[in-house]
Amino acid sequence: MRNSEKQDNLVRAFKALLKEESFGSQGEIVDALKQQGFESINQSKVSRMLTKFGAVRTRNAKMEMVYCLPAELGVPTVSSSLRELVLDIDHNAALVVIHTGPGAAQLIARLLDSLGKSEGILGVVAGDDTIFITPTMPVSTEQLFKSVCELFEYTG
């Protein structure tokens, strides 16, 4: 096996362990990786990996201090602004289309739906990361596009 393959396997195993287990010390992580066949792993390597992947120590449900990885990029968090979740807004003659981070479309669609006809929105359909918005009759798609861009402070 090539070095890059070994490194990829180590990274996958490391991330999986931190997601699935509760490790209170770097030594526990070293032991778990050695049990998976990574014999050359040591505490300093684990320390560098924890730093590289942004791992932090936090309290779990049992109030124990454990290492965990931050949420994956693009996944909404409590502190995420809705504006940060909107990646692109575009339109054609019939629809306004919003592209979001993975899993964020339904949250944003719910907000848009709540604005309703008073804001020129006839209906909203959301998938995982794409939203289709249809304007009401008196509102043009261009007007709705501009309103949605203002709402999310999108300048794209």
Swiss-Prot record:
Domain of life per record: Bacteria
Gene Ontology terms, MF aspect: arginine binding; DNA binding; DNA-binding transcription factor activity
SUPFAM superfamilies: C-terminal domain of arginine repressor, Winged helix' DNA-binding domain
Pfam families attached to this UniProt entry: Arg_repressor, Arg_repressor_C
Compartments it resides in: Cytoplasm
Biological pathway: Amino-acid biosynthesis; L-arginine biosynthesis [regulation]
Single GO biological process annotation from the record: L-arginine biosynthetic process
Chief location: cytoplasm
InterPro entries, per database record: Arg_repress, Arg_repress_C, Arg_repress_C_sf, Arg_repress_DNA-bd, WH-like_DNA-bd_sf, WH_DNA-bd_sf
Record's GO cellular component terms: cytoplasm
Record key words, sorted: Amino-acid biosynthesis, Arginine biosynthesis, Cytoplasm, DNA-binding, Repressor, Transcription, Transcription regulation
NCBIfam families (UniProt xref): argR_whole, PRK05066.1
Family: Belongs to the ArgR family.
Purpose of the protein: Regulates arginine biosynthesis genes.
Name of the protein in question: Arginine repressor
Biological source species: Vibrio campbellii (strain ATCC BAA-1116)
Classification lineage: Bacteria, Pseudomonadati, Pseudomonadota, Gammaproteobacteria, Vibrionales
GN (gene name): argR
